[in-house]
A protein has these predicted regions:
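Active-site acidic/histidine proton-transfer and metal-coordination neighborhood
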Residues: 59-68, 73-163, 173, 243
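Active-site-proximal loop/turn and secondary-structure-junction residues that shape catalytic pockets
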Residues: 10-12, 40-42, 74-76, 107-111, ...
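Glycine-rich, proline-tolerant flexible connector loops at the mouths of alpha/beta enzymes
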Residues: 35-60
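Short secondary-structure boundary/capping segments within folded domains
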Residues: 26-28, 58-61
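Histidine-acidic metal/acid-base catalytic patches
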Residues: 1-34, 89, 93-99, 143-166, ...
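Short, conserved active-site loops that position catalytic residues or coordinate cofactors/metal ions
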Residues: 31-41, 70-74
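Flexible, glycine- and charge-enriched loops at secondary-structure boundaries
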Residues: 14, 18-21, 47-50, 54, ...
Length: 254
């Protein structure tokens, strides 16, 4: 059975910014989650990203029995396709202070050259595992980009230097069939963001997959069964604790 992670944003972005992450780690642990994803963009101020603050948050999570993911909205590659070494190093430093198992970045503008040796140099000796996520934008959300990235890493001699966060709902946002993406990228997937999309155009919103969603079930079946699965859809604000417990149990067994 896969570990289930709750992403901080599931509790509402405003609620997390106002009350901090620590409050919601307690709710996540009580719901039976194995991990919690800290979102840098939901910090109330830069002080929350200090080494001291992150270490304190990480220690509090460890006492609750939770492991962590550290998510930053920064991109691994600039829009011009250049490796952003500064963004990568900063993310690794902050994730290490938190004690995170994974550090997650967006892919950004990767084009052809991965600069794999430089990535390997950055992650060498660091505990957090680097993963990149398919996003909602054209740049960084293209199936061809991700196929090309992993081909380039292998070609440059560093095939296992990073893994992938597979966001089911973001493929839908980009108009890509998640099952097609899963079949092509499964070997590289180490973490799964679970959500679907409802609505049209810019009014699309993340939501929980239905219990009888055959497409979602097929995607999970195509991905490695042991990788952690994260809840990245909003809970009902009127029954957050009950919703969290329900979806943790459901996703663990899905």
């Amino acid at each position: 059975m896969a570990d289930v992670v709750i992403v901080a944003s599931a509790f509402g972005m405003d609620a997390v910014r106002a009350g901090g992450h620590a409050k919601w780690t307690s709710v996540s642990a009580a719901a039976g989650a194995g991990g919690f994803e800290v979102r840098r963009e939901l910090f109330a101020s830069d002080a929350d990203a200090s080494v001291e603050a992150l270490r304190s948050l990480g220690n509090a999570m460890a006492k609750l029995g939770l492991w962590s993911v550290y998510s930053t909205p920064e991109c691994l590659y600039t829009p011009e396709g250049v490796l952003d070494v500064y963004a990568l190093r900063l993310a690794l430093i902050e994730a290490t202070a938190l004690g995170a198992r994974f550090v997650k970045l967006q892919l950004g503008g990767f084009a052809a050259h991965a600069n794999a040796a430089a990535i390997a140099a950055c992650v060498r000796g660091m505990s957090p595992r680097l993963v990149v996520e398919n996003g909602q934008l054209e740049q960084g959300g293209s199936l061809a980009q991700f196929v090309g990235l992993f081909d380039a890493l292998a070609r440059e001699g560093h095939a296992g230097v990073l893994g992938m966060t597979f966001d089911v709902g973001n493929w839908l946002w980009r108009g890509v069939a998640p099952l097609d993406a899963a079949q092509q990228l499964a070997a590289h997937v180490e973490y799964v963001h679970c959500k679907t999309m409802n609505g049209e155009g810019t009014r699309r919103l993340a939501s929980a997959p239905a219990a009888d969603d055959a497409q979602f079930a097929a995607v999970l079946a195509s991905l490695p069964p042991h990788v952690p699965r994260a809840i990245e859809f909003p809970f009902d604000a009127t029954r957050i604790e009950a919703d969290a417990a329900h979806y943790v149990a459901w996703l663990a067994a899905a």
